[in-house]
A protein has these predicted regions:
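Membrane-embedded transmembrane alpha-helical bundles that form the catalytic cores
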Residues: 1-494
């Protein structure tokens, strides 16, 4: 069930909200949310609800064991030393990564073994469960936080179930860290201010997805997949670039739109998830970009992989090795395809170069910092080419499209396809470019200053009405677009 589907907007969401707020007490509300979340998942994956329940039960058990092995008042545990706790973590990782590996990578491994060694192994043909990359990572987060003493283990399996399966973040994130919402599972206090802020966030996310991402998806698909050219090598340089830029905008508004909707839904039920995006396309370096893009995944790998491997505490060579491990895993996390592996290693190269420059050539590293526009242009060039690799069906398509972008095939500079797409989508392109900028925080800061100088009555009320009118218009336009049956799937549902 998609957040941007009629079934969700007109059926599941209003019914769930109504029942939730009619129920008395935190316990009943939590149980209902878990039941609603399992129904939400079963709507698209009825068979894999059993896999979800196995993931919940397994991580609940590993969490209890992690808490037990931390106890210092049990003499027989002291005699065993740290090994039971470590073995428990190894088994937990094997359990979660085993689930992820079998369903996500089995076909990829079999295919590569057959091609490399001339084998005839049968492809298991397993269907990828929606959201498995997210809920397995959340399960690991829960157990690791308990193991580290950063959170208390839950005695009730239903509480762990709610954390893992809560429907706003279940399908495509953000990856919610257990220690960030542990207290809110049974100690949150819903209020109308949070609810209203959640509705605002949800509408903004819906607008990003339906009004912007879906339109750019159509541009990217037509050109990337060669539907507009008899011979893809005839694609003009400008057309190749407009396809790459369209996908760059599509994936941002698609994924950040989903994240906004997830954060908004969480707020409606009293949960405060950490933001997942912070205007990544204004970044002045590749390192800065990854501090702003998919922040829940970046921080997960930082805290659970990079730092345990030694982080920045060891010498530069070891830091580079740690960085390599993180970005190899990041690429694989996104999918069972060599394009994702290369995409991860592509970013590793740039991040490693930036790290080396900061350590060994600080003056060179500071040059881009002194010229923000230059730093942003270089970063966006790296990002756009990276998205071409990410979007391509295979490495040959990625190499071909990048070659077309730089005219290495002798393809023309421009053509009628580029001209048509620019004229047809000029308004969306302009709106998207503005929406990528952090204008809203600047506007809020300016309004705060005006409130101080002129008083809230002079500024806050009329601008508040204007904001509400804009949100209402955005909602109506999004619903109208959905009524037309426009392009709708979320990109990160595939991961």
């Amino acid at each position: 069930m998609l957040f941007s589907s009629v079934e969700f907007l007109c059926g599941f969401l209003p019914f769930t909200l109504m029942v939730y707020y009619l129920l008395p007490g935190r316990r009943l509300r939590n149980r209902f949310l878990l039941l609603a979340s399992l129904f939400f998942y079963a709507w698209g994956e009825p068979l894999y609800v059993l896999l979800m329940l196995a993931c919940i039960a397994g991580n609940y058990t590993f969490g209890l064991l992690a808490a037990l092995f931390r106890r210092q008042d049990v003499k027989w545990l002291e005699k065993l030393g740290p090994w039971p706790a470590r073995l428990n973590i190894v088994l937990m990782l094997a359990f979660n990564l085993g689930l992820l590996g079998v369903y996500k990578y089995a076909g990829f491994v079999v295919s590569n073994l057959n091609q490399s060694f001339g084998l005839q192994l049968e492809d298991p043909g397993l269907v990828l469960p929606i959201g498995i990359s997210f809920f397995t990572f959340q399960g690991m987060s829960y157990v690791l936080d308990v193991f580290r003493g950063q959170a208390q283990a839950r005695r009730n399996v239903l509480d762990v179930g709610l954390y893992v399966a809560f429907f706003p973040q279940l399908i495509a994130g953000p990856i919610v860290r257990y220690n960030t919402i542990a207290k809110e599972i049974d100690g949150r206090r819903e209020n109308w201010r949070d609810f209203a802020a959640g509705v605002d966030l949800f509408i903004i996310g819906l607008g990003k997805k339906v009004l912007l991402a879906n339109n750019f998806a159509l541009i990217a698909e037509k050109i990337f997949d060669g539907a507009t050219y008899d011979n893809p090598l005839e694609m003009a340089v400008a057309a190749a670039w407009i396809a790459a830029v369209a996908y760059t905008l599509q994936i941002y508004f698609d994924f950040s739109g989903y994240s906004d909707m997830a954060l908004g839904l969480g707020r409606m039920f009293g949960f405060h998830f950490l933001p997942n995006f912070n205007y990544p396309y204004v970044a002045r370096s590749v390192t800065d970009f990854w501090r702003r893009w998919h922040m829940s995944l970046s921080s997960w790998f930082r805290d659970y992989v990079y730092i345990p491997l030694g982080g920045n505490r060891l010498g530069l060579p070891r830091q580079i090795v740690n960085l390599f491990a993180v970005w190899l895993l990041t690429g694989l996390w996104h999918g069972a395809n060599w394009t994702f592996v290369v995409w991860g290693l592509y970013y590793f190269c740039f991040l490693a170069v930036e790290k080396i420059c900061r350590e060994k050539l600080p003056k060179l590293a500071g040059l881009l910092g002194k010229i923000p526009l230059l730093g942003n242009l270089v970063t966006m060039l790296v990002v756009i080419i990276g998205w071409v690799i990410f979007r391509s069906a295979d490495l040959s398509q990625a190499v071909q499209h990048i070659g077309l972008m730089f005219g290495v095939y002798g393809n023309p500079l421009t053509d009628e396809i580029f001209t048509f797409q620019m004229l047809e989508n000029r308004v969306q392109l302009a709106v998207a470019c503005v929406a990528c900028l952090p204008l809203l925080p600047l506007l809020k800061h300016g309004l705060h200053r005006l409130h101080v100088v002129l008083g809230r009555g002079w500024v806050g009320v009329p601008l508040g009405v204007l904001r509400d009118c804009c949100l209402l218009l955005m909602l109506l336009l999004a619903l109208a677009a959905l009524a037309k049956g426009s392009y709708n799937p979320f990109i990160y549902f595939n991961f």
